[in-house]
Amino acid sequence: MYFTTLQRLYSKGHLRGLVRSLLKQIIVKCGGVPYLLANDSHPDIVYIGVDRSRDVFGDSPSLSAGVAAVAPNGEYLGADTTNLDKYTDDFIDISSILPSIITQVKQKRPGVKIIVLLRDGGKYNISEHEVTSAIKITKEANLDLVFLSANKSSGFRAFIKKDSEIKGFSCPVAFYELPNDPEDFLIFSTLPKQGTQTPILYSILANTSSYSNNEIKQLVSNDLTSLCSLVWEAPSPTNLPLPLHYADKLAGFCKTIQHPWASEIETPLFI
């Protein structure tokens, strides 16, 4: 399942972490939600994944955008869908979907202060109007916003050397800033049992919180790596973070049935 040495596997503390990770995955595979096993280190932050699904071969647009919200510990907080423009990947109007998901989030997490929006796609494919609309909506809800582009197609597996050998890298998660653009950063795991998640490339398109961009990078690097371990469809540690995984499943499902998400479904099982 994981490529590692027996010496590392049975080293002090490593076996405990491996069992803890596998226990979460076993619970997910059996249909449970193991968020109670995770540390809720940031109760004031919620992650919202945004993804889209397109059918370019159909006569009708048949396009859907899925939005799913989870807490940093993996607790499911809500989901919704909207339509996309037939000729573009951008949303027709993001204001038609964010308010409803924020309402669901506030009902379950009244102490939320920061929304971290994970938008699938490269930063150059996301319209400025979408970013400004998201800022306006969260401001009206008295929330701060961190808007991140996250291109799923940029994933690959990689392992990092020991923490002491790479300047600025912290164990077990590390972020690496790209020299061409300080708002772009990669997320790596320094633990072989985790591998590298998908996607690894993120870009900060907006940050209205009191955190600096560097603090945001470290915070989301830790949280997103943890959220990857809560997805278990195949024996691979290169999964999407939970909110993007949920949004991807939701968008594809609603595109297929050509019908919006049913609000009566309170807790779906996206596996």
Where are these regions (language model features)?
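Long, contiguous domain-sized segments
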Residues: M1-I271
